[in-house]
Amino acid sequence: VASHVKQKTDHPLWFMWACLLHDIGKPLVTTSDGHAPLHNEAGVQVFQDVPLITSKKERQYISTMIMYHMHLMNMSRHQARDISYLRLLKKIDGKVSMNDLIYISCCDKLGRGKVAQEQYDAFWTFIQDKQQRLGCQAIPALIDGHDLIEYGFHNHQCFKDMLEEAYDLQL
């Protein structure tokens, strides 16, 4: 399936690597009943040891695709709120386009074999609604580290947590 859509992605070769490796964590976490909880997180860890790909940007793209390849389908299935979609946009910002994430999600779903047309249609309706109303890019943060320094904050170790909380409240 992936080979049919790769040319529609931002980085066709990187996309194909991501499709090949997206389930690489499954052997580590698959249970006796066949479920593979958190295989995406395990996959990112396994990918860290893959020496074939050396470009930092390419590794970041593939890691992000491995980590989030199931998120859109899960969001659609559970009718996730807008804030979940906006948080996902922030997590992939500058690493992977929403377009590429949609393609890997669809390839993953269609690659399993039988997919109910209603389920696939519901996914597209969900995604199109989110994109039309909320966009495909992360909302820029209203404050950054420079602002915190300007306002007199000095504990730089807390900046990341403070900025993440501020961004979440902004959404």
Language-model segment annotations:
Residues 2-117:
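Divalent metal-dependent catalytic cores for phosphoryl transfer on phosphate-bearing substrates
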Residues 109-171:
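Charged substrate- and nucleic-acid-binding regions of tRNA-handling and nucleotidyl-transfer enzymes
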